[in-house]
Amino acid sequence: LKIDTQSFRSIIRGHKLQGDKLDEGIKGMFDVDVLCEPSDFKVCLIHTVPYFTGAGMMGVHIIHNVLAHIEGLCVDYCYLPESTVRKALKSNNIPLFGFGTKIPLREFDVLGFSMFFSPNVCNMVHIINYAQIPFLAEQRGEEWPILIAGGVLNTAPEAIAPIFDVMFIGEGEEQVPVIMETIKKMKKEGKKKEDILKAVALIPGCYVPRFYENIFDPSTKRYAGYKKLWDGAPDKIYWQKVDISDPKYNYTIVDYKKDVARNRLYLTKDVEVTRGCVHGCRFCAPFSWYKPYRERNFEGVKEAIKARQDMGTVRMMGLTPTDYSRYNEARDYAISLGIQYDGYSERIDQFERTWDDNRRKKSVCFALECANAEMRRRVNKHLPDDVFWAAFKKAIGAGIIKTKVMCMIGLPFETQKDVIDLHNLMDEMWRVSREIRPMSAIELSVNLFLPKPHTPFQWAAHRESPWMADFVRIYNEKFNDGSYVVFDEKLGRNVVKGWRNVKGSPAGRRLEALLDRADRRFCVPMIKTILKFNIYSEQDWGESNSKLWVGVKTYMQIHYGYDIDDTLRELEFDTPFPWDIIDVGTNREFLWEEWQRSSKAHETEGCNFGCANCGVVSKYPQLNGKSVCSQKKKWFDESNPSGVLQLAPDQIKGGTNG
């Protein structure tokens, strides 16, 4: 079965909704054909965002590049359809299909979902619904595709675990081809789904939820751990990490001149130069996920830059791309080819080093995180006040049009003084910018803190800052009373040249925290509520998720006698976490020690200054001697075959860590 594209185009046009980005959506769905042979093993990569948002995501390109080289495997793609297309699908009972092949998703062998952000869960539910596929893995027999989830959302998988047959944990370049080859071979041999999933469960990084079940405390109704339902299942699932310095990973992502099918996944200007980070902010989950810090070899970076010569622009990508040891060489190489270099948010302490790039920008973005030095010590953000102000003044003085500063509110150990300091920071930013360059634009972006699994703050309670309402009120008063207004001579009127941007509604962030800490009981009520209120992540995340929160809360109370507010409480050291089955490499004892150090406002030095014995190096021997995390020291040798660091307490930067 293939969808008749001409007929469907006509149907879509008849359902055009005002404000819908229909042209982009139709371009993604119909401009290119992906040809599959009848005998091909068919895989569709599903991205839980609209086409115009997701087509440039690097993870999309990496996995597509890996799969496109497997013989006898046909790779298609699908995105969340635009609202007009969704209306047409529903009204005409047409199942959602692969954009390239026009084959309904339910007829593929494997559907691979990219799960990167908590709000994407809403879109994922709708995609499965429009594909006319049963939601729960236990409802899908032999005739249905195998559903696989990939992406960082899988580090806390239990809220969506009942939906998927397989959840891949970590970096996929090495193991994703193994997974597909295994399924392809066994399906060709006529093996049952149960046998296929048992084989996949033994592939590193593969979590097969059906082989485990949650355990609950009968008295408190709280999550109490997990047990295996099949003895052959792994006890833990380890996040997969790849040695990106290996030349075999030197890919340009797509050859957009030759490969028509992948041309729809247009060449992104991003060039990955690093994975991981050495700085150790305690709120940052990617710091734990992507440890240890690794760098791509320079020849691979040059190859990727050159592939973007016709684009005219390139951007180095990584958690902290300016840490790349050959950053300046890569930038100069791009310039020598006539390619304009762009950048992400700047590390304030490296602003001087990258000044040649920054002074040409129209805007810069500084991640300050906290308004005062004590709170920055608590979150382990190694940044003195004078370094920030030096960078801020230099940016304003250089004529950069907009300078954005990002901070958080609702952090552990936060006091009202810390919130007052945010207001003072805003006033000082305004005063300094007026003195240096009166017409410069400044922006203070404030996000609500979220305690993330696998970080030192995973034990923290998720709370709405008791001062959040006051903070927003004072913000509004300052803008309404003219505090931030100047007279623009060109326009001949008063204008606001600094502006507020408070992101992350309390309701939305509360729901994200719940999804991180949720167990499998939450899955069904979540699906029911998303469908009932027709919730998408592109909507007002706060307003929509107030409904979703109430719906899930009511269901859990009625069916399980459990108050979901209890899920967001502060946790003890030995509290069982729903994500305990996932091991990203960092020891629990190390994270607890960091949590205690945060309570005392004590910093721990970054991995580039010394090893704090977090546990990663003992679990990933394939990265032995290739990680800046341990100063490229070979921890695995004849005298220390286990790789466990044998350090005295005074040798550990920042204190002992179990």
Predicted regions, residues:
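Canonical Radical SAM [4Fe-4S] cluster-binding loop centered on the CxxxCxxC motif
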Residues: 57, 262-299, 609, 613-631
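N-terminal pre-triad scaffold of radical SAM enzymes
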Residues: 43-49, 67, 254-285, 448, ...
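A glycine-rich phosphate-binding loop feature that marks nucleotide/adenosyl-phosphate handling sites
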Residues: 199-209, 319-324, 346-351, 441-451, ...
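Radical SAM enzyme core and accessory elements
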Residues: 1-32, 39, 45, 482-658
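N-terminal [4Fe-4S]-dependent radical SAM core
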Residues: 8, 13-44, 51-52, 209, ...
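A short beta-strand-loop structural module common to alpha/beta enzyme folds
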Residues: 72-84
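Conserved SAM/AdoMet-binding glycine-rich loop
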Residues: 45-49, 302-443, 447, 451
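Glycine-rich beta-alpha loop elements in corrinoid/cobalamin-binding modules
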Residues: 82-229, 456-506, 512-519, 523-534, ...
